[in-house]
UniProtKB/Swiss-Prot annotation:
Name of the featured protein: Acyl-coenzyme A oxidase 2
Organism (species): Candida tropicalis
GO molecular function: acyl-CoA oxidase activity; FAD binding; fatty acid binding
A Gene Ontology term for the protein's cellular component: peroxisome
Family: Belongs to the acyl-CoA oxidase family.
C-alpha cells in the first residue's frame, strides 16, 4: 500500500495510510452471495402434494384413457420441431406468424392422414391453446366447412366433398365458412348474398348485390381457401326461401381466383394475426344445382322447392365450435392459473418486519382472493366441458343413426337433445369465454410488471382469446337466446309439461320452487351442502323466470339483461351438478384427493355463483340475509386458507408441460428470474446494444447549439447590428 507523503513542517507526524476499502459484512446489506431462491420455494410447496397426480388428472379429463392420450399428445407436440413453442415466436411479425402457421398446418395434416380422427381432434384442440391462429385456420375447414356439409348436405354430398375431393385431410380442397357479412353477423337469417336458380342452365347464380352483403371475417379466405360454403338467400321463380348453403369454388388448381370472385385481406386485427381473414364478393358466379347442400331443403330440376319440418337441424353444424370454445376455456384457465400461482409462490415482495424475509405474494389474503376462485372455476370447467363434449358426440351419433334408419322415436329424442344442446353450449360458451377473458387479465395483473412481458404469454393470449366472445355466436346474443329458452321452459313446466330426455329436467321442480316461501339457504351449515346449493340455483332460476314471464309477453328485448343472468346461472348449475356427480362417482371417500376437491368445489360455488349473484338470491328470498356476509366475505377467505398450501400441487395436476405453458415465469422448476433473464438474452442478443435507429438518437443527442443552427441570426451581435 503506498504511503501518504508527510508535511515538511519540522514536527513528527504519525504515519498515514490509504483508507481500508475492504467490504465489510454488515447486517441488512444485500449480498451478492444470497440471490432470491424462487425455485426452492416452489419445490418446497410442491412437496406438500399429498394426492396422486394421475388420479387427479383422470378426474379432470374424465377417464384414464383420455388422460393418457392428453399426456402423450403433450409429449408429441413438445418434441415436434415445427409444432413446439419457442420464446422468439412472441417477436414475430404478421408475415412471420402466418408463415409459421402455414408450416404448422402442413405438419398437422400429416397427422390428420395417419391417426384416428378422434385423436387428431384432441391434438388440434391442444394446439389451438398454444397457437389459436393454427386452430382456427384448420377448424374453418375440418370443423366449420365440413360440419356444414355434413349437417346440411346429403350423405353422398358429404362423401364427395370430404372423401373424393379430400377436404377431410386438407388435400386438393381447403374450405372456408362463408356465413358472416359486412352488414350481418349474428342475424344469419338476414344475410343478403343471393343464390338465384336458373332453370334453363340448372345452375345457381351466386351474387353480392351490394356492399353490405360482402362476406366479411371469413377465416382462410384471403390466401388459403379454394372453396367456401356460402350462406345465401335461395331465390327460385322470384320467391325468397331464406338462407341456405351452397358450395362455391373460389380458386383454380393454380390457386388463382376464379371469374366473378373478388377476395381481399381484411388487414390487421386485435389478435390472431396468423389467420388470413378475408372478404369475398361474388359477381354472378354460376355453380351447378347440386352444389346446393340438400339434406333438408331440396330444389329439383324443374325448380320445385321442398322444405322439410326438420330444417332447424341445419344449424347443428355450429355446435362443435361452441363446444370447442367452452373446452378451450378450461385449458386456457389451467395454463394461466398455473403461471400466476407458480409466480405467486416464487415471488416475494415486502417484509412484515425489518430483517425478516419478504412475503410470498400468495401469502397475501387479497392475492388468494384474486387467484384461487379462478383456480376453482377452472376445475369446474374441466369437468363440465368434458361432459359437454361427450354429450355433443352422442347427439351427433344418434342423429346419424336416426336419419339412416328412419327411427322416429330416436329422431324425436335427438331433436329434444338438440334443443338442450343449443341452450347448454350457448350458456357454457358465452359464460366460460367471458370468464376466461377475465381470468387471463386478472392473472396477468397478479404477476405485476412481469405479466406485461410478451414472453410470459398473457398479452398475446388475451388479444387472441377475446374474439371468442363475439364469434360463432356473439356472447350476449347466445346468452339471451339461452335465457329466452329457459324462461319458456319454466313457463311450460308451470303449465303442466314434464321435461324428459333434457338436461333441463331439474326445472321440473319449478312449480314447487317458484312458490317456496322459505329460503333454501338459511344458516351457515347450508352453504356446505352441495345439493342444497344446487336446489338454491334451481329455485332462483325458477322464481326469476316466473317473474319475467308477464314482461316477456310485451317485449323480450326489455329483459335482455335478465336473460343473460339466467344463461349464466344455467351454466353454473351445469358445471356444479357435473362436478358433484363426478366427485361422488370417481373419488373414493378415503382418497387423499377428496378433501382438496371438496374445498375446490365449495370455493367454486361460493365465489363464482353465490357471491356474484347474491343480489338476485336475496331479492327472490332464496338465501337469507343473515348468511350473506358469511357467503361474500368470511367463508371464501376460510376456503382460500384451506387451499393455499396446495396451490402448486393443484396446478401440477393439470399436467401441462413447460412447452405448452410457454411462459418464462411459469416454468415447472420455478426458477423465475434465471429462466426469464437467460431467455430474454437469447432472443435479444445483448451485443446488439445499438438500435437500428441509433442514427436518429445520436443526431438528437449530438445536435449543435441552437444559436449555431440559427446561423447566429438571433444573437446579441446580430441584434446590435440590425437595431441601428
Amino acid at each position: 500500500m503506498a504511503m501518504l507523503s508527510q508535511p515538511n513542517d519540522g514536527h513528527d507526524h504519525p504515519e498515514k495510510k490509504d483508507p481500508d476499502t475492504t467490504p465489510k459484512q454488515v447486517a441488512g446489506v444485500i449480498s451478492s452471495q444470497d440471490p432470491p431462491h424462487p425455485a426452492k420455494d416452489v419445490a418446497e410447496e410442491r412437496a406438500r402434494t399429498d394426492w396422486d397426480l394421475k388420479e387427479m388428472h383422470e378426474f379432470l379429463e374424465g377417464d384414464e384413457a383420455k388422460s393418457e392420450q392428453i399426456l402423450r399428445l403433450y409429449q408429441s407436440i413438445e418434441r415436434d420441431p415445427i409444432l413446439q413453442t419457442r420464446p422468439e415466436q412472441f417477436d414475430y411479425t404478421q408475415k412471420q406468424e402466418r408463415e409459421l402457421v402455414a408450416n404448422r398446418i402442413n405438419q398437422m395434416t400429416k397427422f390428420l392422414e395417419t391417426e384416428p380422427y378422434g385423436k387428431f381432434r384432441r391434438r388440434l384442440q391442444l394446439m389451438t391453446v398454444i397457437d389459436p391462429s393454427l386452430g382456427i385456420r384448420m377448424l374453418v375447414n375440418i370443423g366449420l366447412f365440413l360440419n356444414c356439409v355434413r349437417g346440411n348436405g346429403t350423405q353422398k354430398q358429404f362423401d364427395f366433398w370430404s372423401n373424393k375431393k379430400e377436404a377431410g385431410i386438407v388435400k386438393q380442397l381447403y374450405g372456408c365458412f362463408g356465413m358472416t357479412e359486412l352488414g350481418h353477423g349474428s342475424n344469419v337469417a338476414g344475410c343478403e348474398t343471393t343464390a338465384t336458380f336458373d332453370e334453363k342452365t340448372d345452375e345457381f347464380i351466386i351474387d353480392t348485390p351490394h356492399i353490405g352483403a360482402t362476406k366479411w371475417w371469413i377465416g382462410g379466405a384471403a390466401h388459403s381457401a379454394t372453396h367456401t360454403v356460402c350462406y345465401a338467400r335461395l331465390i327460385v321463380k322470384d320467391v325468397d326461401y331464406g338462407v341456405k348453403t351452397f358450395i362455391v369454388p373460389l380458386r383454380d388448381s393454380r390457386h388463382s381466383l376464379l371469374p366473378g370472385i373478388a377476395i381481399g385481406d381484411i388487414g390487421a386485427k386485435m389478435g390472431r394475426q396468423g389467420v388470413d381473414n378475408g372478404w369475398i364478393q361474388f359477381t354472378e358466379v354460376r355453380v351447378p344445382r347440386f352444389f346446393m347442400l340438400q339434406r333438408w331443403c331440396k330444389v329439383d330440376r324443374q325448380g320445385n322447392v321442398t322444405l322439410p319440418p326438420l330444417e332447424q337441424l341445419s344449424y347443428i353444424s355450429l355446435l362443435e365450435g361452441r363446444v370447442g370454445m367452452a373446452t378451450d376455456s378450461y385449458r386456457i384457465g389451467a395454463r394461466y392459473t398455473t403461471i400466476a400461482l407458480r409466480y405467486a409462490v416464487g415471488r416475494r415482495q415486502f417484509s412484515k418486519k425489518a430483517g425478516e424475509p419478504e412475503t410470498k405474494l400468495i401469502d397475501y389474503t387479497l392475492h388468494q382472493r384474486r387467484l384461487l376462485p379462478y383456480l376453482a372455476l377452472t376445475y369446474a370447467a374441466a369437468v363440465g366441458t368434458d361432459r359437454l363434449e361427450r354429450q355433443h358426440e352422442e347427439l351427433l351419433a344418434n342423429l346419424d343413426i336416426a336419419l339412416a334408419k328412419k327411427d322416429k322415436l330416436l329422431l324425436k329424442n335427438t331433436i329434444t337433445g338438440t334443443k338442450s344442446m343449443f341452450v347448454d353450449s350457448g350458456s357454457l360458451k358465452s359464460t366460460l369465454t367471458w370468464l376466461a377473458a377475465d381470468l387471463i387479465n386478472e392473472t396477468r395483473q397478479a404477476c405485476g410488471g412481469h405479466g406485461y412481458s410478451s414472453y410470459n404469454g398473457f398479452g398475446k393470449t388475451y388479444d387472441d382469446w377475446v374474439v371468442q366472445c363475439t364469434w360463432e355466436g356473439d356472447n350476449n346474443v347466445l346468452a339471451m337466446s339461452a335465457g329466452k329458452t329457459i324462461i319458456k321452459t319454466v313457463q311450460q313446466v308451470l303449465n303442466g309439461k314434464e321435461l324428459k330426455d333434457s338436461t333441463l329436467e331439474f326445472l321440473n321442480a319449478a312449480p314447487e320452487l317458484s312458490k317456496a316461501k322459505k329460503a333454501v339457504i338459511r344458516i351457515r351449515d347450508h352453504v356446505d351442502d352441495v345439493d342444497r346449493v344446487l336446489k338454491a340455483i334451481a329455485g332462483l332460476i325458477s322464481k326469476f323466470s316466473k317473474d319475467l314471464i308477464p314482461i316477456s309477453y310485451q317485449s323480450w328485448d326489455s329483459i335482455g339483461a335478465q336473460r343473460v343472468i339466467l344463461s349464466k346461472l344455467r351454466c353454473h348449475y351445469y358445471l356444479l351438478e357435473t362436478f358433484n356427480e363426478r366427485l361422488n362417482d370417481k373419488i373414493k371417500a378415503k382418497s387423499p384427493a377428496r378433501p382438496h376437491l371438496e374445498n375446490i368445489i365449495k370455493l367454486y360455488y361460493v365465489t363464482n355463483i353465490l357471491g356474484p349473484f347474491i343480489d338476485e338470491f336475496l331479492r327472490f328470498g332464496v338465501i337469507s340475509p343473515q348468511v350473506a356476509k358469511y357467503i361474500t366475505y368470511e367463508y371464501p377467505q376460510k376456503l382460500c386458507a384451506n387451499i393455499r398450501p396446495y396451490v402448486i400441487g393443484l396446478t401440477d395436476s393439470f399436467q401441462q408441460p413447460d412447452n405448452f405453458i410457454n411462459s418464462l415465469i411459469g416454468k415447472y422448476d420455478g426458477n423465475i428470474y434465471t429462466n426469464y433473464l437467460e431467455s430474454v438474452k437469447d432472443v435479444n442478443d445483448p451485443s446488439n446494444y445499438k438500435a437500428p435507429y441509433s442514427e436518429a438518437l445520436e443526431a438528437m443527442l449530438n445536435r449543435s447549439a441552437l444559436e449555431n443552427r440559427e446561423r447566429s441570426e438571433r444573437g446579441k451581435a446580430a441584434a446590435d447590428i440590425l437595431s441601428k
